[in-house]
C-alpha cells in the first residue's frame, strides 16, 4: 500500500481487505504539510465482531501449529521488514511527521521486536520436577490464551504494534489490532508483509477506528486479553473496563520523565543526551525527557548549553535532509502545546527559548519549535502534566536528595535518568527513585525487546509489562500436570 493509492484505508479481516460497514471517515494528514493523504473508516462494533470471529476461527489451527513453523514465519517476516526498511521509514515520516532518521531507527526497533518474537520458543518452555513424592512428578506447560486485542498509539506506528502481535502470535495466539486512526497506513503495510511471509488468514486482523472499536474489543467475550499503549486517561479506562470484563490487561500510559544532572556530570554529554531525549520525535514519546532537575552550582552553565544546542536544531519536513525536529501530530495538538507554553509564562517560569517564534511554526504543518523553561516549580502545569511535545522544564535543586524527592512527587513513573560520575549517587538514584526504567548518562533508557518495558504509578496499569519474559507470561497460560507412575 502506498500513500498515493491509499485513498480509503480498509480493514484487514480473515486475510481479506474489506471496507468497514461504517460510512463515517476521518482524514489522515501529513502533519508536515497539513495535506490529507488518506481517509480512515471509523469502524463499528460489527466490524470488530467480524474480526474477532475470524481470529477465533484461526486460533483453532494456529494454536496447534508447530512452534518451529510459527518461528520460521516470523523469521521470514523479519527479513521482509529488512528488505522494505526504507519504504517503511518513509511511510512513518509521512503519516507521523518524525524525521526520516528517527523513523529509520523506529523500523530497527520494530525489527528487533520481531527477532525477539521469532526466538521466543526458548522462553515458552515449561518446567518439570520429577519425584516430588515417591513415584510422583509434576510439570508446568504453557499454552496460548486465544484472541488478543491490541490498541496502539500514533507516535510509534511500527514499533508498538511490533511489541505486541509478533510475540502474541509466536505464543500461538491470534490478534486483532486497532492502530491509531491518525497513523493507519504503516499498520496496513505491516499486515501486507505478514501475509507475504506466510501468516495464515485470520491470525492477524486490523480494524481501524476510534472509540467504538476500543469498546468492541474490551467488551467482546472471545477477546481474552488486551495490550494497550496510549494516554493516561485512556489507559486507566481500558484497564478498568477490560478487567471488569474479566480480561488480562496491560495498559502502558503517560509519563513525565525526570533527568537529574549533578555537579560532577559531563555537561557536554548531558546536554547532547537531554536535547535528543527532549526534542526527538517532537517530544511525542513516553520516554521523552520532560523535566531536568539540576544542582544550582551548574544550572546556569547547563541552561546556556541547552539553549545553544536547541538553537542549532533544524525544524521542518522530516523527509528533508538535516531535519531533526518534525511537526507534532495535529493542529489541535499544536494549539494545546502553545497553551502549555502560555501557561508556563503565566505561572512564572522563565522562558529561555520560545518555540512559538520559530519560522516553521508560522508556515504550513503543525510545527512547534524546541521550547525551554527555567526556574520551573512543581506547582506549575508544565511540571505536572504530560505535554507530549517539544517542551522542556528545568528545576533547580540543592542536592540529589531534593531532585529525587521532586521526581517522586510526580504521578507518573515511566523513566528517569541521572548524569554523574559518582557510583554512590547512581546507587542512591537506583534504590530510591520511583520509576520503572532508569538511565545513567543516557537520555532515553528504553530497554531492548528482550527486557520488560514500562513504568510504575500512573504510567502503567496491570501486572505484566510489554516485551521480554513479561510478554511471554502475558500471552500464555499455564497448566500443571501431576502424575503418578508406579512400577
UniProtKB/Swiss-Prot annotation:
- Tell me the function of this protein: Catalyzes the oxidation of malonate semialdehyde (MSA) and methylmalonate semialdehyde (MMSA) into acetyl-CoA and propanoyl-CoA, respectively. Is involved in a myo-inositol catabolic pathway. Bicarbonate, and not CO2, is the end-product of the enzymatic reaction.
Q: Cross-referenced SUPFAM superfamilies, in alphabetical order? A: ALDH-like (SSF53720)
Q: Name one GO biological process term.
A: valine catabolic process
PANTHER family (UniProt xref): MALONATE-SEMIALDEHYDE DEHYDROGENASE (PTHR43866:SF4)
What is catalyzed by this enzyme? 3-oxopropanoate + NAD(+) + CoA + H2O = hydrogencarbonate + acetyl-CoA + NADH + H(+); 2-methyl-3-oxopropanoate + NAD(+) + CoA + H2O = propanoyl-CoA + hydrogencarbonate + NADH + H(+)
- The record's active-site residues are 286 (nucleophile)
Q: Which UniProt keywords apply?
A: NAD, Oxidoreductase
Q: Which organism is it from?
A: Bacillus anthracis
GO MF, one example: methylmalonate-semialdehyde dehydrogenase (acylating, NAD) activity
Listed EC numbers: 1.2.1.27
What Pfam family is a match for this entry? Aldedh
Q: Which Gene3D superfamilies match?
A: Aldehyde Dehydrogenase, Chain A, domain 1, Aldehyde Dehydrogenase, Chain A, domain 2
* Record-listed NAD(+) binding positions: 154, 178, 181-182, 231, 386
The protein's name in its UniProt record: Malonate-semialdehyde dehydrogenase 2
Tell me the InterPro entries matching this sequence: Ald_DH/histidinol_DH, Ald_DH_C, Ald_DH_CS_CYS, Ald_DH_N, Aldehyde_DH_dom, MeMal-semiAld_DH, MSDH_GmP_bac
Give the protein family.
Belongs to the aldehyde dehydrogenase family. IolA subfamily.
Matches recorded under PROSITE patterns: ALDEHYDE_DEHYDR_CYS (PS00070)
Quaternary state and interactors: Homotetramer.
Pathway it acts in? Polyol metabolism; myo-inositol degradation into acetyl-CoA; acetyl-CoA from myo-inositol: step 7/7
Alphabetical list of CDD domains matching this protein: ALDH_F6_MMSDH (cd07085)
Amino acid at each position: 500500500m502506498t500513500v498515493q493509492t491509499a485513498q480509503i484505508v480498509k480493514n484487514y479481516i480473515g486475510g481479506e481487505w474489506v471496507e468497514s460497514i461504517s460510512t463515517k471517515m476521518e482524514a489522515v494528514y501529513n502533519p508536515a504539510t497539513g495535506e490529507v493523504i488518506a481517509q480512515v473508516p471509523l469502524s463499528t462494533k460489527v466490524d470488530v465482531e467480524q474480526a474477532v470471529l475470524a481470529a477465533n476461527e484461526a486460533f483453532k489451527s494456529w494454536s496447534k501449529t508447530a512452534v518451529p513453523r510459527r518461528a520460521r514465519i516470523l523469521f521470514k517476516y523479519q527479513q521482509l521488514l529488512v528488505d522494505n526498511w526504507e519504504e517503511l521509514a518513509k511511510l512513518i515520516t509521512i503519516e507521523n511527521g518524525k524525521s526520516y532518521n528517527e523513523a529509520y531507527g523506529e523500523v530497527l526497533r520494530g525489527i528487533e521486536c520481531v527477532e525477539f518474537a521469532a526466538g521466543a520458543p526458548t522462553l515458552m518452555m515449561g518446567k518439570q520436577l520429577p519425584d516430588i513424592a515417591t513415584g510422583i512428578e509434576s510439570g508446568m506447560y504453557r499454552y496460548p490464551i486465544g484472541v488478543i486485542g491490541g490498541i496502539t498509539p500514533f507516535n510509534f506506528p511500527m514499533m508498538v504494534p511490533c511489541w505486541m502481535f509478533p510475540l502474541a502470535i509466536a505464543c500461538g495466539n491470534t490478534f486483532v489490532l486497532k492502530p491509531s486512526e491518525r497513523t493507519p497506513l504503516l499498520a496496513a503495510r505491516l499486515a501486507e508483509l505478514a501475509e507475504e511471509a506466510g501468516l495464515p488468514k485470520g491470525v492477524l486482523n486490523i480494524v481501524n477506528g476510534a472509540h467504538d472499536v476500543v469498546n468492541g474489543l474490551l467488551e467482546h467475550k472471545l477477546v481474552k486479553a488486551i495490550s494497550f499503549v496510549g494516554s493516561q486517561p485512556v489507559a486507566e479506562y481500558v484497564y478498568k473496563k477490560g478487567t471488569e470484563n474479566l480480561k488480562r490487561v496491560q495498559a502502558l500510559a503517560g509519563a513525565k520523565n525526570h533527568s537529574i544532572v549533578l555537579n560532577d556530570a559531563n555537561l557536554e554529554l548531558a546536554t547532547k543526551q537531554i536535547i535528543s531525549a527532549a526534542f526527538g520525535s517532537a517530544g511525542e514519546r513516553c520516554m521523552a525527557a520532560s523535566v531536568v532537575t539540576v544542582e544550582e552550582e551548574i544550572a546556569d552553565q547547563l541552561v546556556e548549553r541547552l539553549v545553544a544546542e536547541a538553537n542549532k536544531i533544524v525544524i521542518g519536513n522530516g523527509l528533508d535532509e538535516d531535519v531533526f525536529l518534525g511537526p507534532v501530530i495535529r493542529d489541535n495538538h499544536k494549539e494545546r502545546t502553545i497553551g502549555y507554553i502560555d501557561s508556563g509564562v503565566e505561572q512564572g517560569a522563565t522562558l529561555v527559548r520560545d518555540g512559538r517564534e520559530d519560522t516553521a511554526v508560522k508556515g504550513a504543518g503543525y510545527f512547534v519549535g524546541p521550547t525551554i523553561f527555567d526556574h520551573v516549580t512543581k506547582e506549575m502545569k508544565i511540571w505536572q502534566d504530560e505535554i507530549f511535545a517539544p517542551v522542556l522544564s528545568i528545576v533547580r535543586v540543592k542536592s540529589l536528595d531534593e531532585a529525587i524527592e521532586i521526581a517522586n512527587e510526580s504521578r507518573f513513573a515511566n523513566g528517569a535518568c541521572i548524569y554523574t560520575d559518582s557510583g554512590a549517587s547512581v546507587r542512591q538514584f537506583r534504590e530510591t527513585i520511583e520509576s520503572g526504567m532508569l538511565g545513567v548518562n543516557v537520555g532515553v533508557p528504553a530497554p531492548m525487546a528482550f527486557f520488560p518495558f514500562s513504568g510504575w504509578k500512573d504510567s502503567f496499569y496491570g501486572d505484566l509489562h510489554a516485551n521480554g519474559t513479561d510478554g511471554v507470561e502475558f500471552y500464555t497460560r499455564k497448566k500443571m500436570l501431576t502424575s503418578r507412575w508406579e512400577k
